[in-house]
């Protein structure tokens, strides 16, 4: 089963593949999937 792993600066990997083209991504609570967020939201969260 794939798992979402959060990297720095709003990047995630999903089973070894970058989510959301590697940017603007957060993992769900249990790391079961990744959610793509627009860059503006990421900047608002201080993750961009």
UniProtKB/Swiss-Prot annotation:
Keywords, ordered alphabetically: Calcium channel impairing toxin, Disulfide bond, Ion channel impairing toxin, Knottin, Neurotoxin, Presynaptic neurotoxin, Secreted, Toxin, Voltage-gated calcium channel impairing toxin
Localization of this protein: Secreted
Pfam family, one: Toxin_9
InterPro entries: Spidertoxin (IPR004169)
Keyword Secreted listed: yes
Tissue expression profile of the protein: Expressed by the venom gland.
Cystine residue pairs: 4-20, 12-25, 19-36, 27-34
GO cellular component, one term: extracellular region
GO molecular function: calcium channel inhibitor activity; toxin activity
Claim: Membrane is one of the keywords in the record: no
Function per UniProt: Omega-agatoxins inhibit neuronal voltage-gated calcium channels. This toxin acts by modifying the gating of the high voltage activated P-type Cav2.1/CACNA1A channel. Is a potent blocker in both insect and mammalian central neurons.
Comment text on domains: The presence of a 'disulfide through disulfide knot' structurally defines this protein as a knottin.
Similarity comment text for this entry: Belongs to the neurotoxin 02 (plectoxin) family. 03 (omega-agtx) subfamily.
Note: This toxin is a diagnostic ligand for P-type channels Ca2.1/CACNA1A in the mammalian brain.
Protein's name according to its UniProt entry: Omega-agatoxin-Aa4a
Organism: Agelenopsis aperta (North American funnel-web spider)
Phylogenetic lineage: Eukaryota, Metazoa, Ecdysozoa, Arthropoda, Chelicerata
